[in-house]
């Protein structure tokens, strides 16, 4: 993109365009413009300003044909008019006029059959760096013939001062115009808006092409056996998919087409609060030159204090995936052999591992369950159930059943085994029982991956009708059936019913969708 290309677009008097700059140029600009500081680890650390996380209430889709008939409108996918979009796009172009701009071209999707060409335009060097880290970097040849399928304009300091007149949530805006293949971001610096914005678009495009898009991590073994790990925040997805005996395909966003599984991204975006080099050596080793730290506290001597959460709990690092030693270079793999749903059940009633039928897999996928521990006024802590459809509802423009149906079809077609793994509590709920030990969970995962779990006999967990193995190598058989781990068996039965009711209540939202009653595969009271 040349300066006169911007002129035609309505972005006037651009001082200079940095078109796909290399890491060294970005590093120099970040320091020169005082956007960040160099740390003793070699990575630059930046602050994302007042927004240290996403702004989901400020995300909108332009409501217009033909996309309006596909989008699941509601609190997550909020509608906005074409007129308001046009007005804010004009403001965005005015705002970017007269500035030095960075244009970053990249791909979302490692599969040649499914990838999309993405362009990001921003005035901020570290945001360009973030895009270079997180998406798939084109070759020189690909850049020569690059034609974007979608362009995202970031105006981080632009506020919409007419938001009340427009009937919007705040002066921040993240708006997707599917028909024009454009998105605009205004008023927030947070890098995750760019990452998850493109993820939302992949979650729109791919299912309409009959391909499944997924919020999961993926790895591959020596026998080319692929495993997918789904789970909400705090369930152990990152930790459990980092396996010394397997190569990482990706840590967060994947597609599944007729050729197999592929990463959407070319990088990782890892949480670093409390990062311990002994517990997570891969992530720690990846934090070096070209990695980009967000919202960490840096001491005067340039050392990073990973324990300090004074800016936010959501401290992060982005880095190109080749910073991880054991990654699969083409970011792809064959159809998965195993799918693992991770739930941190703080009620302490789900088994450490259970095998799911296809119908149960669709049910638990649509439920997207975990339980968080929340503090109450009197200092009593009790679990709070969290349900997020498909383990990533915030990023799904289409109705969750669209993704569940595709998952069911693919499980059937490729004979995939699906398991539910509880990384939460055993022996009682939070406060009475204890957290499932990491070695026990790893042993369950290993038994799934090496196939030995299929040799076990199974018993049935009542109400939930889950198949529980009676033997898993490396796991104390006494903990495999959760009821056995509770001293008060009646209290366990009551808690199991309580959780079943929460599942049933959550699932009422799906009544009357499609021609299949998914609820039959869930708990029955």
Curated annotation (Swiss-Prot):
Pfam families the UniProt entry points to: PEPCK_ATP (PF01293)
Residues involved in substrate binding: 54, 190, 196, 316
Binding site for Mn(2+): 196, 215, 252
UniProt-annotated location(s): Cytoplasm
GO cellular component term, pick one: cytosol
EC number: 4.1.1.49
Positions that bind ATP: 196, 215, 231-239, 280, 316, 441
Cited InterPro entries: PEP_carboxykinase_ATP (IPR001272), PEP_carboxykinase_C (IPR013035), PEP_carboxykinase_N (IPR008210), PEPCK_ATP_CS (IPR015994)
PROSITE patterns reported for this sequence: PEPCK_ATP (PS00532)
Any Gene Ontology biological process: gluconeogenesis
SUPFAM superfamilies cross-referenced by the UniProt entry: PEP carboxykinase N-terminal domain, PEP carboxykinase-like
GO molecular function, one term: phosphoenolpyruvate carboxykinase (ATP) activity
Gene3D superfamilies: 3.90.228.20, Phosphoenolpyruvate Carboxykinase, domain 1, Phosphoenolpyruvate Carboxykinase, domain 2
Cofactor: Mn(2+)
Pathways per UniProt: Carbohydrate biosynthesis; gluconeogenesis
Catalytic reaction(s) noted: oxaloacetate + ATP = phosphoenolpyruvate + ADP + CO2
Sorted UniProt keywords: ATP-binding, Cytoplasm, Decarboxylase, Gluconeogenesis, Lyase, Manganese, Metal-binding, Nucleotide-binding
Cofactor note: Binds 1 Mn(2+) ion per subunit.
Alphabetical list of PANTHER family matching this protein: PHOSPHOENOLPYRUVATE CARBOXYKINASE (ATP), PHOSPHOENOLPYRUVATE CARBOXYKINASE ATP
Family named by the database record: Belongs to the phosphoenolpyruvate carboxykinase (ATP) family.
Protein role: Involved in the gluconeogenesis. Catalyzes the conversion of oxaloacetate (OAA) to phosphoenolpyruvate (PEP) through direct phosphoryl transfer between the nucleoside triphosphate and OAA.
Protein's name according to its UniProt entry: Phosphoenolpyruvate carboxykinase (ATP)
Lineage: Bacteria, Pseudomonadati, Campylobacterota, Epsilonproteobacteria, Nautiliales
């Amino acid at each position: 993109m040349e300066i006169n290309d911007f002129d035609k677009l309505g972005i006037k008097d651009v001082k200079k365009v940095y078109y796909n700059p290399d890491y060294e140029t970005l590093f120099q600009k970040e320091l020169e413009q005082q956007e960040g500081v160099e740390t003793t680890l070699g990575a630059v650390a930046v602050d994302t300003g007042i927004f240290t996380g996403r702004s989901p209430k400020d995300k909108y889709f332009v409501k217009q044909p033909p996309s309006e008939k596909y989008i699941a409108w509601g609190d997550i996918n909020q509608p906005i008019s074409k007129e308001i979009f046009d007005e804010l796009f004009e403001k965005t172009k005015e705002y970017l006029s007269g500035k030095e701009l960075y244009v970053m071209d990249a791909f979302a999707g490692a599969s040649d059959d499914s990838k999309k060409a993405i362009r990001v335009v921003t005035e901020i060097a570290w945001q360009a760096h973030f895009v270079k880290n997180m998406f798939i970097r084109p070759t020189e040849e690909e850049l020569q013939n690059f034609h974007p399928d979608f362009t995202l304009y970031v105006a981080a300091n632009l506020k919409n001062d007419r938001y009340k007149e427009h009937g919007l949530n705040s002066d921040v805006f993240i708006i997707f115009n599917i028909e024009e293949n454009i998105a605009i971001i205004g008023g927030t610096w947070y890098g995750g808006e760019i990452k998850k914005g493109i993820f939302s678009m992949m979650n729109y495009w791919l299912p309409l092409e009959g391909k499944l898009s997924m919020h999961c991590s993926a790895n591959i073994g020596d026998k080319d056996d692929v495993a997918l790990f789904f789970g909400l925040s705090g369930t152990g997805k990152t930790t459990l998919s980092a396996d010394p005996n397997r190569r990482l395909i990706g840590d967060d966003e994947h597609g599944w087409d007729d050729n197999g599984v592929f990463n959407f991204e070319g990088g990782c975006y890892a949480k670093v609060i409390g990062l311990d080099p002994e517990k997570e050596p891969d992530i720690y080793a990846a934090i070096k030159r070209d990695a980009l730290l967000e919202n960490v506290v840096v001491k005067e001597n340039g050392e990073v204090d990973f324990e300090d959460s004074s800016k936010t709990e959501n401290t992060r690092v982005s880095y190109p995936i080749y910073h991880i030693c054991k990654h699969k270079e083409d970011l792809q793999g064959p159809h998965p052999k195993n799918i693992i749903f991770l739930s941190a059940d703080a009620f302490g009633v789900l088994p450490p591992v259970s095998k799911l039928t296809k119908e149960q897999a669709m049910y638990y996928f649509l439920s997207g369950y975990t339980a968080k521990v929340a503090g109450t006024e009197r200092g009593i802590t009790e679990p709070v159930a969290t349900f997020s459809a498909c383990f990533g509802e915030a990023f799904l423009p289409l109705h969750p059943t669209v993704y569940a149906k595709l998952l069911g079809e693919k499980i059937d077609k490729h004979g995939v085994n699906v398991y539910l793994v509880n990384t939460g509590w055993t022996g009682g709920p939070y406060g009475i029982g204890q957290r499932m030990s990491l070695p026990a969970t790893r042993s369950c995962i290993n038994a799934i991956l090496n196939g030995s779990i299929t040799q076990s006999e199974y018993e049935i967990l009542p109400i939930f009708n889950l198949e529980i193995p009676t033997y898993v190598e490396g796991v104390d058989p006494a903990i495999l059936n959760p009821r056995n781990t509770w001293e008060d068996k009646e209290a366990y039965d009551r808690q199991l019913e309580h959780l079943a009711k929460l599942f049933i209540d959550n699932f009422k939202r799906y009544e009357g969708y499609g021609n299949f009653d998914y609820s039959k595969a869930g708990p029955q009271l």
